[in-house]
C-alpha cells in the first residue's frame, strides 16, 4: 500500500467548486461556534458568578440546535437548499452581531445573551442540516466516503482548535471582539455562498411513491423502516450516541481513581479527538474499503470494546489509549455512516433523514450524560463505562446478525471519465440510488 493511498482523499475539493464553498462555510460555522462557546461561557459566568447560568446557556443552545436540525431537515426537502443555507448563515451572523453589541454595552443584559443564543442555535441547526443534505448532490457517488472524511476531519480539528483560539482572543480582548470576529467571518462566508447554483430537492422520475413528496416527517420514518440499511444505521447510530464515550465520567475518574488534577483532566478530554484526527487524516484506506458495511460494524464493535477498556483501565495512560482508540473507531463509523446513509437515501428525503442523524448526536449527548451519571451512582464510574461499552458492542453484533443487508452493503467504486465535467459544477444534481435496490 502506497503512503499516498493512506492520506485523506481531497478529490471532492478539487473536482467540485460548490462543494468547496459548502466545505468552507461549514468550517467557518464550526470554528465560529467553538470560539463563541468559550466567550459565551466566560461572559455568562462573569455576569452571574453561577455555573447554573452557564448550564442554562448551554442547554438553550443544545435544545435550539436540535429543533433547528429537525425543522431544517423538513425544509431542506421542501424548498431550494441554497436559499435555506443563505438565510440560515445570515441569521447566524446577526445572532453573533447581537452578542457582540450586547457585550460592548456598559452593562450587558443576560436576557439578550440567552435570546441571541437561542437564535444562533436555531440558525446553526438549520444550516448544518441543510449543508449535510446538499453535499452528496455536489460530488460523485464514489466520492461520498471522501466527502464524509473531510467533514469529519474539520469537525474534529474545529473541536480542538476553535476553543483554543477563542480562549486566546478572549484573554486578549474580552468577549465582544470574539463575537464580532465570528459575526464578520460568518457574514463573509454567507457572501461566498451566493455563488452556489440553485439546489432544489431532486426527485427520481421513475419514483412511484408520489405521496412521499409531501414533505411529511412520517414519510422519512416509513422509508427508514422499509429500507433495512438506513433503518439499521439510524438504530445503531442512536445507540452509539446514547452509550458512547462517557465524557461526564472524566472528572470523577481523574480526581478519585487516577489521582490526577486539572492538567490530567484536560489531557484526557483531548484523547478521543486525537484518535479521530489521526484516522481522518489517514482515511484514504477507509474511502477505498471494498466492504464498507462490514467495516462500519467492526468499528462500532471496536468502539464498544474501547469503552470497556476505559472502564477497566485503572490508570490515566491506559485510559488515554482506550479513549484514543474509541475516538478513532468512532470516526471510522461516522465516515462510513455518512456515506452509506447518503448513498441509500433518495434526495427528496435526504434532508429529513440527515436531520435525524444530526438530532441523534445532540439528543443522544444530552440523554447519555444523564444515563451514565445515573448508572455511575448505582455502581461506579468504571462500572458505568463497562455497561455502556458492553451495550455498544452487543448492539453492533446484533445488527450485524439481524441485518445482513448492512453487513454486505457496498458503495460505488467506479472511476468516472476524466473528460466528464466535475461534480457539482453542472446544472443537474447527482441522483440518489433507487430505494428499491437498497431494501434487501
Indicate residue ranges for each PLM-predicted region.
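Alpha-helical transmembrane-bundle signature of multi-pass membrane transport and export proteins
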Residues: 1-440
Amino acid at each position: 500500500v502506497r503512503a499516498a493511498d493512506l492520506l485523506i482523499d481531497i478529490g471532492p475539493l478539487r473536482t467540485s467548486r460548490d462543494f468547496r464553498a459548502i466545505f468552507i462555510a461549514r468550517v467557518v460555522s464550526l470554528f465560529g461556534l467553538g470560539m463563541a462557546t468559550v466567550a459565551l461561557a466566560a461572559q455568562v459566568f462573569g455576569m452571574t458568578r453561577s455555573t447554573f447560568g452557564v448550564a442554562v446557556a448551554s442547554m438553550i443552545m443544545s435544545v435550539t440546535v436540535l429543533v433547528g436540525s429537525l425543522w431544517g431537515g423538513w425544509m431542506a426537502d421542501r424548498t431550494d437548499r441554497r436559499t435555506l443555507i443563505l438565510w440560515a448563515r445570515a441569521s447566524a451572523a446577526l445572532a453573533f452581531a447581537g452578542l457582540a453589541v450586547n457585550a460592548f454595552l456598559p452593562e450587558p443584559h443576560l436576557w439578550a445573551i440567552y435570546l441571541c443564543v437561542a437564535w444562533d442555535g436555531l440558525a446553526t441547526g438549520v444550516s448544518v442540516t441543510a449543508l449535510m443534505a446538499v453535499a452528496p448532490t455536489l460530488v460523485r457517488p464514489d466520492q461520498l466516503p471522501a466527502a464524509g472524511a473531510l467533514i469529519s476531519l474539520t469537525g474534529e480539528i474545529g473541536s480542538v482548535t476553535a476553543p483554543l483560539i477563542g480562549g486566546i482572543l478572549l484573554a486578549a480582548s474580552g468577549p465582544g471582539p470574539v463575537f464580532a470576529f465570528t459575526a464578520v467571518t460568518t457574514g463573509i462566508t454567507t457572501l461566498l455562498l451566493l455563488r452556489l447554483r440553485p439546489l432544489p430537492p431532486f426527485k427520481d422520475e421513475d419514483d412511484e411513491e408520489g405521496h412521499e413528496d409531501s414533505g411529511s416527517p412520517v414519510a422519512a420514518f416509513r422509508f427508514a423502516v422499509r429500507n433495512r440499511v438506513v433503518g439499521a444505521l439510524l438504530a445503531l447510530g442512536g445507540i452509539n450516541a446514547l452509550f458512547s464515550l462517557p465524557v461526564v465520567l472524566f472528572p470523577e475518574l481523574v480526581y478519585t481513581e487516577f489521582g490526577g488534577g486539572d492538567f490530567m483532566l484536560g489531557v484526557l478530554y483531548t484523547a478521543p479527538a486525537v484518535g479521530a484526527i489521526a484516522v481522518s487524516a489517514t482515511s484514504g484506506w477507509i474511502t477505498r474499503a471494498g466492504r464498507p458495511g462490514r467495516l462500519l460494524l467492526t468499528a462500532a464493535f471496536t468502539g464498544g470494546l474501547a469503552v470497556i477498556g476505559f472502564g477497566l483501565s485503572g490508570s490515566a495512560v491506559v485510559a488515554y489509549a482506550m479513549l484514543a482508540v474509541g475516538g478513532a473507531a468512532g470516526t471510522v463509523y461516522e465516515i462510513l455512516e455518512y456515506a452509506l446513509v447518503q448513498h441509500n437515501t433518495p434526495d427528496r428525503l435526504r434532508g429529513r433523514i440527515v436531520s435525524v442523524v444530526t438530532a441523534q448526536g445532540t439528543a443522544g449527548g444530552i440523554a447519555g450524560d444523564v444515563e451514565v451519571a445515573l448508572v455511575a451512582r448505582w455502581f461506579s464510574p468504571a462500572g458505568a463505562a463497562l455497561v455502556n461499552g458492553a451495550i455498544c458492542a452487543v448492539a453492533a453484533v446484533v445488527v450485524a446478525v439481524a441485518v445482513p443487508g448492512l453487513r454486505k452493503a457496498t458503495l460505488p467504486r467506479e472511476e468516472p471519465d476524466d473528460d466528464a465535467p466535475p461534480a457539482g459544477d453542472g446544472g443537474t444534481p447527482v441522483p440518489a440510488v433507487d430505494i428499491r435496490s437498497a431494501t434487501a
